[in-house]
Amino acid sequence: MENQYIYRVNASSTTLRSGIAVAEEIEPSITFSAPPEFQGEPGHWTPEHFFVAAVAGCFISTFSGIAHFSKFEFLSLELETEGTIAKDEGGWRFTQVTLRPRLKIAQEKDLDRAKRLLEKAERSCLVVRSLTTLVTMEPDIVLEEEFIERQKMGNSVPIS
């Protein structure tokens, strides 16, 4: 079916609270553990990191696709993504994911368009659309010359 795709991952337990995830035709496999705060092994990817990484990867891919189809040129995109978990009556769950994209552009005339395309990427990202968790975005759109100045000064001030 053209409007449906299936993605498979196989996971197996290797030690108490740890394992390995494998996807066909994708290298490398990924070792994972429960987070240390839940008696997992430190220094490993966790299911919580996978969750946040899925949101981040989807957002980057979605924005890049939208920018390409919109013929919007940007110099770089970096994304800090933060997931917050909390315990409620049903147990632990993600309560919020915050996206902090930092988009570097060359021309001031593209500031408003850049913001609109970032917002469209947030709305269009299939992983974000699949969540019941609150997802917020704190964009930082930087002009190339301003980016160079910020690097010299060592600070960042979002443009909104």
Give a label for each model feature.
Residues 1-53, 63-160:
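Extended beta-strand/beta-hairpin segments
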